[in-house]
Amino acid sequence: MFMFYIKWIKITANQKESRIDFAPGLNIIYGPSNTGKSMVLDCIDYMMGAGTHRFDVNLKVEKIQIGIDVNGEGLSISRDVNTQSFEVISHVDGIETSTYKLKGGKKNPPINDVWMKLFDIPLDTKILKTQEGKPQALTVRTFYHTFIIDEDRIHDKA
């Protein structure tokens, strides 16, 4: 079983890099308005397979990179903005260094495979989509909201 945490996120925008580091356990991102809190969450969402980003075009975001510690081993995922490709460099058994795609295909698996392996969830897991019992594939984006809580959801519950 994998124990993992996001170790860092690096954003390249307007040919400059910004990096935020995380620690194992609960990380809380807080601060005044317009300081980048939502940007961090948007980056994580985008790296977990969001088809589109919510980055302000004026920021000129070019690339997102994320570093993950998996039982002390390194895994990095890189994605150029407005592409469907993810470059994964893995030192983790069971996760291949390769080019992954948003949806996957014959040559490239979907990025969801990396995340599902990290969560130790079988890749072919299905869940019920509708009240009629129609099945759909379980993806990390299906349950993303359970471990990434944004400020809007906190205010909704207050």
PLM segments and residue spans:
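Extreme N-terminal "head/tail" segments of very large remodeling/mechanoenzyme assemblies
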Residues: 1-77, 82, 87-88
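Extended, charged alpha-helical "arm/stalk" segments used for dimerization and assembly
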Residues: 82-158
